[in-house]
UniProtKB/Swiss-Prot annotation:
The protein's name: 2-isopropylmalate synthase
Enzyme Commission number(s) of this protein: 2.3.3.13
Record: residues binding Mn(2+): 14, 202, 204, 238
PANTHER family documented for this protein: 2-ISOPROPYLMALATE SYNTHASE 1, CHLOROPLASTIC-RELATED (PTHR10277:SF9), HOMOCITRATE SYNTHASE-RELATED (PTHR10277)
InterPro entries: 2-IPM_HCS-like, 2-isopropylmalate_synth_dimer, Aldolase_TIM, LeuA/HCS_post-cat, LeuA_allosteric_dom_sf, LeuA_bact_synth, PYR_CT
Gene Ontology MF term list: 2-isopropylmalate synthase activity; acetyl-CoA C-acetyltransferase activity; manganese ion binding
Family: Belongs to the alpha-IPM synthase/homocitrate synthase family. LeuA type 1 subfamily.
Keywords: Amino-acid biosynthesis, Branched-chain amino acid biosynthesis, Cytoplasm, Leucine biosynthesis, Manganese, Metal-binding, Transferase
Function: Catalyzes the condensation of the acetyl group of acetyl-CoA with 3-methyl-2-oxobutanoate (2-ketoisovalerate) to form 3-carboxy-3-hydroxy-4-methylpentanoate (2-isopropylmalate).
EC supergroup of this enzyme: transferase
Domain Pyruvate carboxyltransferase: 5-267
Length: 509
């Protein structure tokens, strides 16, 4: 019988530390709901003491989820722990995650503390946290560069003070398979407690070993894995949870352990994070990449046609990828469209379907067939526009002279107010973005601009991601349209709308 490996998702906390990623309040809530549907055991919803926005989003998630534990991060500071308590007290299963650095380099250069000071702080703050929470998780930051005897002391101190979960972070992705497994074996054999202690692994991917090290931790005695969807996170990212989960599933003969994830929700969860983070999943990404179940070689294709297991160790359907796609066309009606939405796993009310069907027909008039990926894109684009404070109404372009283009942009807010401005620029994109900047009266710096095609062919929809720097803050925007310039404008407007929305939240505080 397989043992249960808990999944601790930190996409909303560590994942959001990815450069250029800044989830909105609504996006955080939608992500949390999808993570619960995916079946993760714990969601680290944020760092409540870091900002009012983080506190409110953690609080909203705690009040919304019904089965998943909601965790908040806290330094060894009572005010941090209090903030987590206030934010998560309405959760079905509230958890506090207390941490302090323990490696020599952190003690000397960051904390300016001795080992004795650190041990005293662990005892004081874990004891305090235990008075407020049934479940207290403790992490010795930079554990893999901490002397092992001192690490054992830190863990024992935390356990004695009431911690029931001990997380061992490979904070800078420094460790390797055997070393990391040895740390867990040492801790499980050395630290003693009358209560059951869950050991957890948290790996970064600086050397490309986050998933491998996470699996090594299980071999060493870990019963919880921390990570993010698609492996997003600071620097090179975190362990990709979908890869850990499928490795355990496929190689259960070796690990003898399984997660409780609803694996069929894996691809949908990955796509959601990719969309909101503005980070496209590489085509060759394990488990969720577009090429994960593609076979280019003639020998491979022949083998798969004869027997799928010749070159596939798991089925696409296992992770929610449909391989029996029936495209729709311009003659498809509302009923066929509604049935397609159901088949793709969407539960959308009839009123919303009316607008989606109009968008579908507009695309169907321009394409020979509308694929499942086109349908997903329509829904994604509609969700983005529905959530935004502002959306693109119309865009007009005109060639002026000497390479200059003129753009007239009309934007509408949720109350129906219209905003219009125009500008010129050296090319269509520059003209469009100058006009949008004038509407929002903000100076911006375009950090990143990416175009991807939703499907193959010259008639494919365009998917545009932008990252802007506005008043020192990075925001991302996303736009989908059959026309590249329309998609580019939608993405830029959405980025401005996100910045405006966050400023409205701050004013309301």
């Amino acid at each position: 019988m397989s043992s249960h490996i808990q999944i601790f998702d930190t996409t909303l906390r560590d994942g959001e530390q990815t450069p250029g990623v800044n989830f909105t309040f609504d996006e955080r809530l939608r992500i949390a709901l999808q993570l619960e549907k995916w079946g993760v055991d714990v969601i680290e919803a944020g760092f409540p003491a870091s900002s009012t926005g983080s506190f409110k989003s953690v609080q909203a998630i705690a009040q919304t989820l019904t089965t998943t534990a909601v965790c908040g991060l806290a330094r060894c500071k009572k005010s941090d722990i209090d903030a987590v308590y206030e934010a998560t007290k309405d959760a079905a299963k509230p958890v506090v995650h207390v941490f302090i650095a323990t490696s020599p380099i952190h003690l000397e250069h960051k904390l300016k503390m001795s080992q004795e000071d650190v041990l005293a702080s662990i005892k004081e703050h874990v004891t305090y946290a235990k008075q407020l929470f049934d479940v207290v998780q403790f992490s010795p930051e930079d554990a893999t560069r901490t002397e092992l005897p001192f690490l054992v002391k830190c863990v024992q101190t935390a356990v004695d003070a009431g911690a029931t979960v001990i997380n061992i972070p490979d904070t800078v992705g420094y460790s390797y398979h055997d070393e990391y497994a040895h740390i867990f074996k040492t801790l499980t054999e050395s630290a003693t407690s009358s209560n059951e202690i869950i050991y957890s692994a948290h790996c970064h991917d600086d050397l490309g070993m986050a998933v491998s090290n996470s699996l090594a931790a299980i071999e060493g005695g870990a019963r919880r894995i921390e990570g993010t969807v698609n492996g997003i996170g600071e620097r090179a990212g975190n362990a990709a949870l979908e890869e850990v989960a499928l490795a355990l599933y496929v190689r259960n003969d070796h690990y003898g352990a399984q997660t409780a994830l609803n694996l069929e929700e894996t691809k949908k969860t990955s796509d959601l994070i990719s969309r909101y983070a503005g980070i496209r999943v590489p085509r060759n990404k394990a488990i969720v990449g577009q090429n994960a179940f593609s076979h280019e070689s003639g020998i491979h294709q022949d083998g798969v046609l004869k027997h799928r297991e010749t070159y596939e160790i798991m089925t696409p359907q296992l992770v929610g990828v449909s391989m029996t796609e029936l495209p729709l066309g311009k003659l498809s009606g509302k009923h066929a469209f509604s049935e397609k939405l159901k088949a793709l796993g969407y539960d959308i009310d009839k009123e919303a379907q009316i607008d989606l069907f109009k968008q579908f027909k507009a695309i169907a008039d321009k394409k020979k067939s509308v694929s499942d990926r086109d349908i997903h894109a329509i829904i994604q684009g509609s969700e983005h526009e529905h959530q935004a404070l502002y959306k693109l109404e119309t865009l007009q372009l005109q060639y002026v002279s000497s390479g200059l283009q003129s753009a007239v942009v009309v934007v509408k807010d949720k109350e129906g107010h219209i905003y219009q401005d125009s500008s010129i620029g050296t090319g269509s994109i520059v003209a469009i973005y100058n006009a949008v900047d004038r509407i929002f009266q903000k100076e911006t710096e375009l950090i990143d601009y990416r175009i991807n095609s939703v499907t193959e062919g010259t008639d494919a929809q365009a998917e545009v991601h932008v990252n802007l720097l506005i008043e020192g803050k990075t925001v991302n925007g996303f736009g989908i349209d059959h026309d590249i310039l329309q998609a580019s404008c939608k993405a830029y407007v959405e980025a401005h709308a996100k910045f405006a929305a966050e400023n409205v939240e701050k004013v309301g505080n």
